[in-house]
């Protein structure tokens, strides 16, 4: 209905940012990505991001931004309430009353126009006769039940109108029904984007992930000869995918692979390098997942380091700076500093707030592992400081690290040190490793020349 309210930030994200200190607030503001994200999101998808910001920014400005965002939608009751809040008034202008009446009348009209076809699509005996061939389906419905192309298109119009009213569940169903029957490729593509947004806004993450694949396939086929169109549509898909990326655990691996695929990592580097923040957060937190020691994770980390190094001149924030400090510059003090800043940025980011603790935990492990690899004798107090822990916490951390990673090390509690046993690599083994690397590079060059 017209009175519907978009889903809240709490509904779409599984955490909330605490009120930061002044320094933390400055860091959060400096690296706020909202202005960069908005151009790539539908206005309904922007709403929860604005609501999330209401705890961090000026409340009046946020209310005004919500009003400007939604005033052209059909959510008339909610928009009217925003107007009253902005103007500190209990009364609303006649234009809101008039628009509400128009919206309700239009809803009634669409419902009547689509009544016949929606009833048919709910009839199991009719649905049982439908096949994967849309042309055959439309012919069957036309001959047996008098369905016209106009009736099918009414599902599309009704679905879009329901979406504009904030009735996302109804919109998803209507757009799905339209897509089953329509042969209009442009409208089908539009309906797929609409259904994707509707599934996001109803937090139907499994259904949303199905739409990710459908949108991706549509981009590859419909825009095959339009590189600029592909770039723009892939950019939108990347941004919209952030919703399931950090709210639906099974989506994490699928979307990480998608973002690292050649077409999409090229899109990120070309059009939206700020997405590296989200890719970095995903890869770092993936360390805590089941495949943390697998070749898949190691490849993701290597790819991330490569892209962060390449794009450092174009985009950086404390999350990407942490990667650079640890794996490019091997600067542990800088890595510790950037980890502290990254924590504040994560807590102020709508998509990443719920991953903050996991990120910090995983990042500390990565610092420890890297530090232990290049030092023979490690001062527990020094390493604890680098991890942002006191000595007792650091000692427990190191004990757990040795146990979990099964490294060959022993703790000298009297001296307060950890002694790492790094077995020397034979010259023979070093030659083998270097030969493997040279052979791989030769294969890559040969493949490139062959193209």
UniProtKB/Swiss-Prot annotation:
InterPro entries in the cross-refs: eIF3e (IPR016650), eIF3e_N (IPR019010), PCI_dom (IPR000717), WH_DNA-bd_sf (IPR036390)
Bias kind Polar residues: ranges: 10-21
Keywords: Cytoplasm, Initiation factor, Protein biosynthesis
Functional description taken from the UniProt entry: Component of the eukaryotic translation initiation factor 3 (eIF-3) complex, which is involved in protein synthesis of a specialized repertoire of mRNAs and, together with other initiation factors, stimulates binding of mRNA and methionyl-tRNAi to the 40S ribosome. The eIF-3 complex specifically targets and initiates translation of a subset of mRNAs involved in cell proliferation.
Quaternary structure, from the entry: Component of the eukaryotic translation initiation factor 3 (eIF-3) complex.
PANTHER family for this protein: EUKARYOTIC TRANSLATION INITIATION FACTOR 3 SUBUNIT E (PTHR10317)
Protein name: Eukaryotic translation initiation factor 3 subunit E
Organism the protein comes from: Aspergillus fumigatus (strain ATCC MYA-4609 / CBS 101355 / FGSC A1100 / Af293)
């Amino acid at each position: 209905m017209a009175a519907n309210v978009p889903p809240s930030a709490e509904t779409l994200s599984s955490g909330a940012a605490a009120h930061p200190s002044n320094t933390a607030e400055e860091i959060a503001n400096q690296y706020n990505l909202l202005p960069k994200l908005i151009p790539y999101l539908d206005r309904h998808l922007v709403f929860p991001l604005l609501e999330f910001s209401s705890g961090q920014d000026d409340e009046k400005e946020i209310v005004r931004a919500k009003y400007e965002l939604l005033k052209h939608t059909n959510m008339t009751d909610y928009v009217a309430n925003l107007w009253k809040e902005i103007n500190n008034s209990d009364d609303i202008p006649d234009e809101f009353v008039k628009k509400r009446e128009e919206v309700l009348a239009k809803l009634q009209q669409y419902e009547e126009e689509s009544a016949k076809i929606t009833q048919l699509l709910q009839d199991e005996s009719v649905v049982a006769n439908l096949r994967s061939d849309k042309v055959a389906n439309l012919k069957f419905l036309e001959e047996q039940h008098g369905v016209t192309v106009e009736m099918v298109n009414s599902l599309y119009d009704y679905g879009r109108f329901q979406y504009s009213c904030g009735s996302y569940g109804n919109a998803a169903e209507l757009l799905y029904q339209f897509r089953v029957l329509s042969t209009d490729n442009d409208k089908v593509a539009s309906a797929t984007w609409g259904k994707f947004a509707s599934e996001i806004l109803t937090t139907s993450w499994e259904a949303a992930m199905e739409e990710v694949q459908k949108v991706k396939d549509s981009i590859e086929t419909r825009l095959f000869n339009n590189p600029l169109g592909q770039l723009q549509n892939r950019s939108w898909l990347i941004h919209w995918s952030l919703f399931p990326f950090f709210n639906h655990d099974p989506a994490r691996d699928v979307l990480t692979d998608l973002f690292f695929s050649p077409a999409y990592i090229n899109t990120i580097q070309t059009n939206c390098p700020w997405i590296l923040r989200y890719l970095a957060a995903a890869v770092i937190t993936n360390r805590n997942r089941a495949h943390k020691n697998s070749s898949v994770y190691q490849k993701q980390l290597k790819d991330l380091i490569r892209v962060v190094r390449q794009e450092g001149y174009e985009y950086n924030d404390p999350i990407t700076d942490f990667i650079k400090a640890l794996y490019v510059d091997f600067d542990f003090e800088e890595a510790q500093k950037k980890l502290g800043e990254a924590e504040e940025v994560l807590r102020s980011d709508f998509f990443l707030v719920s991953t903050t603790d996991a990120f910090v935990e995983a990042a500390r492990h990565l610092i420890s592992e890297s530090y232990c690899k290049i030092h023979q004798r490690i001062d527990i107090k020094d390493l604890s400081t680098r991890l942002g822990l006191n000595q007792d916490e650091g000692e427990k951390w190191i004990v757990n690290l040795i146990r979990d990673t099964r490294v060959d090390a022993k703790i000298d509690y009297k001296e307060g040190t950890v002694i790492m046993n790094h077995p020397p690599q034979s010259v023979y083994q070093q030659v083998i490793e270097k030969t493997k690397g040279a052979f791989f590079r030769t294969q890559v060059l040969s493949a490139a020349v062959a193209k």
